[in-house]
C-alpha cells in the first residue's frame, strides 16, 4: 500500500473527529419572569489558558453562534444585553449564565463553549431552557359551623348516714385478794361494726344499724368496783365506712386467759357507747357521743420477782438446742483433730524416709572415694 492513500485516509479521519462536537445537554425548566441560571462548570480552569463564551443554539464547530457573553479567563469582555450575567467565580471555573427577567423568546438551546488549548480539546455544553407560565391555583375556603349544645343534668344529693362502731369491751375478774391461790383473769372482747348507705331520699336510721354491745359475765370470780372514771373521745376507737346499701354486722369474740399470782396488778375496763340517730332530711353524718371508760386502780403489795418467772417448758426448749449444738461442735472438733494428726504423721514419715535416702547416698559417695584412693595407692 502506498503512502499517499494512507495519508489521505488519516486526514479524513482527523477532519471527521474535528467536525464531531464533544457536547452534553442539560434541561432547565423555569417560570416566566423569574431569574434563570444555566449551569456551566469547568474544574480545570486556568485564567492564563482558558476562555469561554455563551451563544444561542447548538454549539458550532468553532466559536459561539450568536454570542451572548464572552470572557478572557478572568473577567467579562463583552455581552449582548445587560440581562445576561456571569454571577459565579470565573477564576474557579464557575461560568454559569444568569438571565434576568426572561421572556418566551428566551426559550431554546444555549451553548457554553470553554476553549482549551490544543486540537479538538474544547468543552461544549448544551443547555435547553424551557419557560412555562405560572399556574393559577384556586383556593377553596371551607366554612365550618360549630354548634354548642348545653345539657343541664339534675343535681342529686345523696345522704349518707353512718353509725359508730361499738368499742371493744374488756372485763377482768379476780377472786378475793386474801386467798393465796393464783388468780384467773379472763378477757372477753366484743367488736361490732355496722356500715349503712341510704338511698337518695332521706330516711330514718334503720334499726339494724345500731351496734349492740353485750358483755358476757365472767365465771371466775366477782367483778371489782370502779375507783376512777376517764372519758375518752369516740374518734380514737371507731372507724366507719359507707360502702353498701345493706347493713353488715361483724362480731368477733375472742377470749384469752392469763395465769397470774395472787398479788399481781388487776385492772378492769368497761366501755359503753351511745348512738344518736339522725333526724329526717339531714344530709350530714350523725356524730356519735363520746365514750365513757371506767378503769380501776392498781393494787399495792405485789412483789416484782413473781413477774419474771418463766415456765420450765420454755427453759427446756432453750437449753436442749444449746446443749445439742455444743455436743455437735465437740464431735466436729474431734474428727478434725484425727485428720490433722494423720496428716502430720504422714508428713513426718516422709521426712524420715528422705533423711534415710540422703544418708545412703552419702555412704555410697564415701565408699566410691575410698575405692578411688585405693586404686591410686596401687
UniProtKB/Swiss-Prot annotation:
Q: Which GO terms describe its cellular component?
A: extracellular region; plasma membrane
Identify the residue ranges that face the Extracellular compartment according to the record: 25-314
Please give the residue positions where the record annotates the modification Phosphoserine.
358
One family from Pfam that matches here is V-set
- Ranges of compositional bias, category Polar residues: 269-297
Q: InterPro entries under this entry?
A: Ig-like_dom, Ig-like_dom_sf, Ig-like_fold, Ig_sub, Ig_V-set
GO-annotated biological processes: apoptotic cell clearance; cytoskeletal rearrangement involved in phagocytosis, engulfment
Which membrane topology term applies here?
Single-pass type I membrane protein
Domain Ig-like V-type positions: 25-126
Q: Does the keyword Transmembrane apply?
A: yes
Cell compartments where the protein resides: Cell membrane; Secreted, Extracellular exosome
Give the UniProt keywords, A-Z. Cell membrane, Disulfide bond, Glycoprotein, Immunoglobulin domain, Membrane, Phosphoprotein, Secreted, Signal, Transmembrane, Transmembrane helix
Glycan attachment residues as annotated in the record = 291
Residue numbers spanned by region Disordered: 136-160, 269-304
Report the sequence similarity comment from the record: Belongs to the immunoglobulin superfamily. TIM family.
Role this protein plays: Phosphatidylserine receptor that plays different role in immune response including phagocytosis of apoptotic cells and T-cell regulation. Controls T-cell activation in a bimodal fashion, decreasing the activation of naive T-cells by inducing cell cycle arrest, while increasing proliferation of activated T-cells by activating AKT1 and ERK1/2 phosphorylations and subsequent signaling pathways. Also plays a role in efferocytosis which is the process by which apoptotic cells are removed by phagocytic cells. (Microbial infection) Plays a positive role in exosome-mediated trafficking of HIV-1 virus and its entry into immune cells.
Q: How does it assemble?
A: Interacts with MERTK; this interaction enhances TIMD4-mediated efferocytosis. Interacts with EPHA2.
Q: Which PANTHER family match?
A: T-CELL IMMUNOGLOBULIN AND MUCIN DOMAIN-CONTAINING PROTEIN 4
Protein's name in the database: T-cell immunoglobulin and mucin domain-containing protein 4
The species this protein belongs to is Homo sapiens (Human)
Amino acid at each position: 500500500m502506498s503512502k499517499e492513500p494512507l495519508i489521505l485516509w488519516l486526514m479524513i479521519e482527523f477532519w471527521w473527529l474535528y467536525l464531531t462536537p464533544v457536547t452534553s445537554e442539560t434541561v432547565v425548566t423555569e417560570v416566566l419572569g423569574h431569574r434563570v441560571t444555566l449551569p456551566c462548570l469547568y474544574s480545570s480552569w486556568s485564567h492564563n489558558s482558558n476562555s469561554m463564551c455563551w451563544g444561542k443554539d447548538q454549539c458550532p464547530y468553532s466559536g459561539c453562534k450568536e454570542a451572548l457573553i464572552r470572557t478572557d479567563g478572568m473577567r467579562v469582555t463583552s455581552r449582548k444585553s445587560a440581562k445576561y450575567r456571569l454571577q459565579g467565580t470565573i477564576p474557579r471555573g464557575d461560568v454559569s449564565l444568569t438571565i434576568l427577567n426572561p421572556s418566551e423568546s428566551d426559550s431554546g438551546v444555549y451553548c457554553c463553549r470553554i476553549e482549551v488549548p490544543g486540537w479538538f480539546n474544547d468543552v461544549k455544553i448544551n443547555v435547553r431552557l424551557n419557560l412555562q407560565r405560572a399556574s393559577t391555583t384556586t383556593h377553596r375556603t371551607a366554612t365550618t359551623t360549630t354548634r354548642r349544645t348545653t345539657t343541664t343534668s339534675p343535681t342529686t344529693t345523696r345522704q349518707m348516714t353512718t353509725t359508730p362502731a361499738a368499742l371493744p369491751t374488756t372485763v377482768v375478774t379476780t377472786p378475793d385478794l386474801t386467798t393465796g391461790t393464783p388468780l384467773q383473769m379472763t378477757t372477753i372482747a366484743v367488736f361490732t361494726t355496722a356500715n349503712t348507705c341510704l338511698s337518695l331520699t332521706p330516711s330514718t336510721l334503720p334499726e339494724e344499724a345500731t351496734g349492740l354491745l353485750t358483755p358476757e359475765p365472767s365465771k371466775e370470780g366477782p367483778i371489782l368496783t370502779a375507783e376512777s372514771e376517764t372519758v375518752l373521745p369516740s374518734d380514737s376507737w371507731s372507724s366507719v365506712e359507707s360502702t353498701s346499701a345493706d347493713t353488715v354486722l361483724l362480731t368477733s369474740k375472742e377470749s384469752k386467759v392469763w395465769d397470774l399470782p395472787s398479788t399481781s396488778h388487776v385492772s378492769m375496763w368497761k366501755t359503753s357507747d351511745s348512738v344518736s340517730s339522725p333526724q329526717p332530711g339531714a344530709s350530714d353524718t350523725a356524730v356519735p357521743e363520746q365514750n365513757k371508760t371506767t378503769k380501776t386502780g392498781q393494787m399495792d403489795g405485789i412483789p416484782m420477782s413473781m413477774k419474771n418467772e418463766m415456765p420450765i417448758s420454755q427453759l427446756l426448749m432453750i437449753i436442749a438446742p444449746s446443749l445439742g449444738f455444743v455436743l455437735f461442735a465437740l464431735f466436729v472438733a474431734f474428727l478434725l483433730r484425727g485428720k490433722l494428726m494423720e496428716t502430720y504423721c504422714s508428713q513426718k514419715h516422709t521426712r524420715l524416709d528422705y533423711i534415710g535416702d540422703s544418708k545412703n547416698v552419702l555412704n555410697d559417695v564415701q565408699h566410691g572415694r575410698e575405692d578411688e584412693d585405693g586404686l591410686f595407692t596401687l
